[in-house]
Amino acid sequence: YGKEICYIMQNPMTAFNPSLRIGRQLEKTCYLHNPQISRQELQLLVSNTLQQLGLDDLKRILKSYPDALSGGMLQRIMIAAALINQPTILVADEATTAIDACNRIELMQLLRQLCSGGMAILFVTHDLRAASMADRILIMNNGQLVEAGTTQIFNEPKEEYTKYLLSACTLERR
């Protein structure tokens, strides 16, 4: 499925190669699926994708090794690596957990915009606030589907496990 389905890993600290600079890793990710791309187009695509995710100090970021960057910054770069090939399906495994609350909301809005542009996102999360931004919700317990529906699940849960989850957290109702 190559560039059609991309994955945002949960832990960017273990996902990046510690011996390669961030810029090189992003370029390799893009070039793997677009071998005909010119060097100039490649650099522009990498820069634009990082800027789209709110990363501005591009020269420093691109020349850095993963261990020189914060967890939140690496998470945004991990998301950029997944988005750089413009997939039709994006699997996001706890993609916003390493990011502070303010940036998490901004990033969730960006992911929502991507969905309106035709990309589907499978968002795996334990954060019910993040899940409340989805169009469809699947509640799972021990790998088993418990309940499925729209965000209406948060207002009218049918299953006991869903009720238990909702009682364990404070969630602003839509």
Language-model features: where?
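Conserved ABC ATPase signature
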Residues: 64-69, 73
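Catalytic Walker B motif of ABC-type/P-loop ATPase nucleotide-binding domains
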Residues: 90-93
